[in-house]
From Swiss-Prot:
The lineage of its organism: Bacteria, Thermotogati, Thermotogota, Thermotogae, Kosmotogales. It holds the Pfam family Ribosomal_L17. This is Large ribosomal subunit protein bL17. It comes from Kosmotoga olearia (strain ATCC BAA-1733 / DSM 21960 / TBF 19.5.1). Keywords: Ribonucleoprotein, Ribosomal protein. GO terms for cellular component: cytosolic large ribosomal subunit. GO terms for biological process: translation. InterPro entries: Ribosomal_bL17, Ribosomal_bL17_CS, Ribosomal_bL17_sf. The keyword Signal does not apply. Belongs to the bacterial ribosomal protein bL17 family. GO terms for molecular function: structural constituent of ribosome.
Length: 149
């Protein structure tokens, strides 16, 4: 029985599945949008959203560190929490530049948003094997939408 089993296996062993998730997430964070199969997009969406949530927390800690004075005794605890969250994100990608981009550029856009950082748009079927393709993209923030209008 599959009670409470959430993750899709995508017909791959654990190590290959993890590498696939990390690769798709990396491309999504670097480019903002990717085209992949619907099954892969649905599988990577929770992974990406959890990373953005951690990055949001790190961004909030960084903001609070900048607002407080250097003499504040709680500032060291905030710094350690910020570093711990960044290291947790870095564990998946092993790329400090990407972690910096996620925490300082991407997560800041979603500070006021409670989840739903990505969207999946179905685009049709692939020609070779008729696999259903989807676009997985980061949701734009309201400030970006207002600039376009």
């Amino acid at each position: 029985m599959r009670h409470r089993v959430k993750k899709k296996k995508l017909n791959r062993p654990h190590s290959q599945r993890l590498a696939l998730m990390r690769g798709l997430a990396r491309e999504l964070f670097e480019h903002g949008t990717i085209i992949t199969t619907t099954a892969k997009a649905k599988a990577v969406k929770p992974f990406v959203e959890s990373i953005i949530t951690k990055a949001k927390k790190a961004a909030l800690y960084a903001k609070e560190i900048n607002e407080r004075s250097n003499g504040d005794p709680e500032i060291q605890a905030l710094r350690s929490k910020n570093v711990a969250l960044r290291r947790e994100i870095n564990r998946h990608f092993n790329d400090r530049k990407l972690v910096k981009k996620i925490c300082d550029e991407i997560a800041v856009n979603y500070i006021d948003r409670n989840g739903g950082y990505t969207r999946i748009i179905k685009v049709g079927r692939r020609r070779g094997d008729a696999a259903e393709l989807s676009i997985l993209q980061l949701v734009e923030t309201k400030s970006e939408e207002n600039v376009e209008n």
